[in-house]
């Protein structure tokens, strides 16, 4: 390692080169996390419901978590989104427009006992899913 009076440039260049050994730095600078994200770095996204699916919970829990397959409008990618709330999936029909957001798992992954599900539904036809579940609003008829 350079220690002389005019060593600053060499030290700077060494730091620059060493940065690339850090996986997270490389992914961030090259934009790979945004490229791999179905929402493209956005906080939320709209999509069309293709079908309702039941996802089996991981051990030691035993349940069928109600989810929907959604095709995003912005890029056509398909994602599975969890429907939070008691009876929430009954308010969602095929071909409805839903708004999805990330579910909040660590490092952008799945949360809790729902394997492979990284998104959750927050609105159906521009009406909050939570409001529908508690009965405060009705779903608009198309």
UniProtKB/Swiss-Prot annotation:
It holds the Pfam family Ribosom_S12_S23. One of its GO terms (cellular component) is cytosolic small ribosomal subunit. CDD domains: Ribosomal_S23. GO terms for molecular function: rRNA binding; structural constituent of ribosome. The keyword rRNA-binding applies. GO terms for biological process: translation. Keywords: Ribonucleoprotein, Ribosomal protein, RNA-binding, rRNA-binding. Part of the 30S ribosomal subunit. NCBIfam families: PRK04211.1, uS12_E_A. With S4 and S5 plays an important role in translational accuracy. Located at the interface of the 30S and 50S subunits. Belongs to the universal ribosomal protein uS12 family. This is Small ribosomal subunit protein uS12. It comes from Methanosarcina acetivorans (strain ATCC 35395 / DSM 2834 / JCM 12185 / C2A). The gene is rps12.
